[in-house]
Amino acid sequence: MSVAGELSIGVRVADGEVRAVELASTRPQASRVLAGRTPADVARLVPMLFSLCGHAQQIAASVAIEAAIGEHTPDSERDKRTRRVRLEAIQEHLWRLMLDWPALLSLPPLRDAFARWYRRCAAAREEAEAGCCRQLASELVDYCDRTLLPLPLAQWLELDDDAALLEPAAAREWGPMLQALSAFDA
């Protein structure tokens, strides 16, 4: 358990439907803040109470509220919510890759690139149209191929030897981040 707290969620499913949900939190003060509030207030406040993945937290709260009051959510809305969570996950991964990793490797953070990608993810999340995740992922793969990796991402992901993951491809220059990572392989 971390200082920030822990949330355990148990779900019982029968006949394809959620029959019971059990929550255990080491942060009971959060539930006290929400007690007595309207469902709309709860959905609005939940992302403010937890620092990680605020949009996913809000969606989870909305889903829990809808289940509690017996409201049916159309498939199109569930699909849109899924895309929003995926886009937020992309943003979180980009944060780590472009800001945290360089700092750990004593390299300058990729702030400008991160800001551009963060804005693109945020804009896509607002609309969350079908295909937006696929399009953004394709563009990210292209960015990785051109900027971060010594060979195309698909080939890099197929490597199964730790040393090979850090070897430069014959015709490509290493990016600074991979050069720093290779120093750890000594």
Predicted features and spans:
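Active-site bordering "gate/hinge" segments
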Residues: 1-186
